[in-house]
């Protein structure tokens, strides 16, 4: 598809219904109104993906402070089936990875993936994510209900925390 354009755009109150519709089609789970209200607050951590000006996918993340770490949680990252394998998911994930890299304070990025979603697991593994645990009955009303937790550890940029050693002079 030479000449096709993939662009990321902001999620706004004017296009939140597009995001809602995409998520209904892409994911086997439904998201409540609080999810969409929160998405409007995260700025660059939520993006719609456009293929030749058509909204075909989205990524939605949040900052999560847990386990004494600053973590980025990918709540959703998905693309309509006819537009998969065109680099759209890669563009969305790279956007998120770049935010974490520029910020420099994230310990890791993580997400949940249904255990049967092999293509998603393979996709994230290409970017250095690893399965760190499996949660039984994570999903309600879908089968299989179990989810893998995939995580990518982020290194602290060199130079940061380098001069922390105390010396007694």
UniProtKB/Swiss-Prot annotation:
Question: What are the disulfide bonds?
Answer: none
Source gene? Answer: NAA50
In the UniProt annotation, what is the result of changing residue 142 to A?
Reduces N-alpha-acetyltransferase activity
| UniProt cross-references to Pfam families, sorted A to Z | Acetyltransf_1
Enumerate the residues binding CoA: 117-126
Instruction: Please tell me whether the keyword Transferase is annotated for this protein.
Output: yes
Q: Where is the N-acetyltransferase domain?
A: 6-155
Q: Where in the cell is it found?
A: Cytoplasm; Nucleus
**This chain belongs to which protein, by name?**
N-alpha-acetyltransferase 50
Q: Which residues carry this modification: Phosphotyrosine?
A: 110
Reactions performed catalytically:
N-terminal L-methionyl-L-alanyl-[protein] + acetyl-CoA = N-terminal N(alpha)-acetyl-L-methionyl-L-alanyl-[protein] + CoA + H(+); N-terminal L-methionyl-L-seryl-[protein] + acetyl-CoA = N-terminal N(alpha)-acetyl-L-methionyl-L-seryl-[protein] + CoA + H(+); N-terminal L-methionyl-L-valyl-[protein] + acetyl-CoA = N-terminal N(alpha)-acetyl-L-methionyl-L-valyl-[protein] + CoA + H(+); N-terminal L-methionyl-L-threonyl-[protein] + acetyl-CoA = N-terminal N(alpha)-acetyl-L-methionyl-L-threonyl-[protein] + CoA + H(+)
Residues binding acetyl-CoA are 77-90
Result of mutating residue 29 to A? Answer: Strongly decreased N-alpha-acetyltransferase activity
Name the consequence of residue 139 to A: Abolishes N-alpha-acetyltransferase activity
Membership in a protein family: Belongs to the acetyltransferase family. GNAT subfamily.
* Subunit structure, as described in the record: Component of the N-terminal acetyltransferase E (NatE) complex at least composed of NAA10, NAA15 and NAA50. Interacts with NAA10. Interacts with NAA15. Predominantly interacts with NAA15 in the N-terminal acetyltransferase A complex (NatA complex); the interactions reduce the acetylation activity of the NatA complex. Component of the N-terminal acetyltransferase E (NatE)/HYPK complex at least composed of NAA10, NAA15, NAA50 and HYPK. Within the complex interacts with NAA15. Its capacity to interact with the NatA complex is reduced by HYPK. Interacts with NAA35.
């Amino acid at each position: 598809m030479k000449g096709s354009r993939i662009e990321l755009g902001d999620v706004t109150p004017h296009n939140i219904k597009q995001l809602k519709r995409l998520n209904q089609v892409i994911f086997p789970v439904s998201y409540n109104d609080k999810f969409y209200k929160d998405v409007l607050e995260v700025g660059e951590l939520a993006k719609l993906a456009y293929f030749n000006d058509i909204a075909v996918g989205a990524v939605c993340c949040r900052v999560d402070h847990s386990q004494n770490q600053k973590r980025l949680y990918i709540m959703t990252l998905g693309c309509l089936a006819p537009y998969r394998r065109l680099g759209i998911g890669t563009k969305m994930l790279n956007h998120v990875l770049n935010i974490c890299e520029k910020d420099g304070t994230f310990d890791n990025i993580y997400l949940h993936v249904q255990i049967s979603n092999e293509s998603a697991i393979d996709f994230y593994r290409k970017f250095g994510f690893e399965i760190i645990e499996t949660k039984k009955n994570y999903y309600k009303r879908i089968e299989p209900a179990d989810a893998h937790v995939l995580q990518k550890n982020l290194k602290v940029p060199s130079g940061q925390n380098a001069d922390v050693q105390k010396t007694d002079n």
